[in-house]
Amino acid sequence: MNRVILVGRLTKDPDLRYTPNGVAVATFTLAVNRAFANQQGEREADFINCVIWRKQAENVANYLKKGSLAGVDGRLQTRNYEGQDGKRVYVTEVLAESVQFLEPRNGGGEQRGSFNQQPSGAGFGNQSSNPFGQSSNSGNQGNQGNSGFTKNDDPFSNVGQPIDISDDDLPF
């Protein structure tokens, strides 16, 4: 089994390129904090190179930037090539199958939560036409503010009014 799950921050903006056949490929590096601290009490980070293909690559390039918090699910792969000096160069990287955006874009709440770039268990050949997993119905967009939530979705909108609940319904 070859499975990698990472959560970290991008060290620089993703690099989006296209193959000669027009297939999009994005590369980026995630800084992932280690689970333990060093002798000085600081948590060190590992810098993991990641690659993602096709429409997901374009989405990553459009919506993530340096410092963005992202979750990556994929597999580890090693490839090699001959460098300019004639020596064999080995590269180990994560081939991302899905990337989740774990914070709002620009910190201003323009986007909601996380966007799953690919349905769970789907392969590259089975990409969703709607990579954000959102309904394309735009009927409620007029009621949305910057947070992306409709005004009726606020569970605390009745703050300050008494709540009618029986003592028998309370768990304590």
UniProtKB/Swiss-Prot annotation:
Record GO terms (molecular function): single-stranded DNA binding
GO CC, alphabetical: nucleoid
SUPFAM superfamilies given in the database record: Nucleic acid-binding proteins
Location of the motif Important for interaction with partner proteins: 167-172
Function: Plays an important role in DNA replication, recombination and repair. Binds to ssDNA and to an array of partner proteins to recruit them to their sites of action during DNA metabolism.
Source species of the chain: Bacillus anthracis
Top-level taxon of the source organism: Bacteria
Domain SSB: 1-103
Region (Disordered): 103-172
Protein name from the UniProt record: Single-stranded DNA-binding protein
Record's subunit section: Homotetramer.
Alphabetized Gene3D superfamilies for the sequence: Nucleic acid-binding proteins (2.40.50.140)
Record's keyword annotation contains Cytoplasm: no
PROSITE patterns membership: SSB
Keyword DNA repair annotated: yes
Bias type Low complexity, positions: 125-148
One record GO biological process: DNA recombination
InterPro entries noted in UniProt: NA-bd_OB-fold (IPR012340), Primosome_PriB/ssb (IPR000424), ssDNA-bd (IPR011344)
Sorted UniProt keywords: DNA damage, DNA recombination, DNA repair, DNA replication, DNA-binding
